């Protein structure tokens, strides 16, 4: 089991998942990538090494970490995936952020990068990359999504799940960040239920 954290997270979060996968070795991936083109190299190299040492490899990935994994890995490197609040359509998210920041495509193309007041820097290079590199994903996948996720809409995640034959579970009242006791209990139950299914 390889755990991939979200923004601001750490590989140490993998410890939490050890009790949920008692028969497996669980390790956290302490990646450095900030963009999908960096992740393409770093993730594929790391997972290739892990794959050479193990017959089966399962991915557990969170938020932006899930997006990097979706953008850089394939069924040759991963046998199964559990995605928690994944960013599955980065183009849509960037376009939403542009609206929040009142930035047009023309402005972004001219300035290349624009800092926002909500802590994100909009990048023309990033937007162009995700448009030119759509996600191709053929790994058996379970997705956990919070009803009130503020980064990805239910329509977007549902469309992704349908297109990629992923099993989607929606937590009523859930958020993008699963962190309360109730949310973590829901996550635990979701992982155990998905683990019982055979692909």
Each predicted region: which residue ranges?
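Catalytic nucleophile-loop/oxyanion-hole region of alpha/beta-hydrolase
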Residues: 28-51
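The alpha/beta-hydrolase serine catalytic core
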Residues: 77-159, 163-170, 174-199
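Short hydrophobic segments within beta-strands
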Residues: 2-7, 60, 84, 144
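Short, surface-exposed alpha-helical segments at coil->helix boundaries
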Residues: 11-18, 37-40, 154-158
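Short coil/turn segments at beta-strand junctions that form active-site/ligand-binding loops
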Residues: 24, 54-57, 79, 139-140
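Gly/Ala-rich beta-loop-alpha elbow adjacent to hydrolase catalytic centers
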Residues: 60-69
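Aromatic pocket-lining residues of Rossmann-like dinucleotide-binding sites
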Residues: 72-73
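Short, surface-exposed "cap/lid" segments of acyl-processing enzymes
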Residues: 1-34
């Amino acid at each position: 089991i390889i755990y991939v954290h979200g923004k601001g997270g750490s590989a140490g979060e993998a410890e939490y998942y050890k009790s949920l996968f008692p028969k497996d070795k669980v390790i956290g991936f302490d990646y450095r990538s900030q963009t999908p083109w960096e992740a393409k190299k770093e993730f594929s190299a790391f997972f290739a090494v892990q794959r050479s040492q193990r017959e089966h490899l399962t991915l557990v990935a969170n938020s932006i970490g899930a997006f990097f994994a979706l953008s850089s890995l394939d069924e040759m490197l991963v046998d199964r995936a559990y995605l928690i609040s994944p960013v599955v359509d980065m183009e849509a998210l960037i376009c939403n952020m542009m609206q929040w920041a009142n930035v047009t495509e023309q402005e972004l193309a001219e300035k290349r990068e624009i800092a926002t007041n909500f802590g994100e820097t909009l990048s023309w290079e990033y937007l162009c990359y995700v448009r030119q590199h759509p996600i191709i994903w053929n790994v058996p996948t379970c997705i956990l999504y919070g009803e009130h996720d503020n980064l990805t809409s239910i329509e977007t995640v549902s469309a992704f799940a349908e297109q990629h034959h992923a099993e989607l579970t929606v937590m009523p009242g859930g958020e993008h960040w699963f962190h309360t006791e109730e949310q973590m209990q829901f996550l635990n139950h979701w992982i155990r239920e998905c683990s019982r299914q055979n692909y």
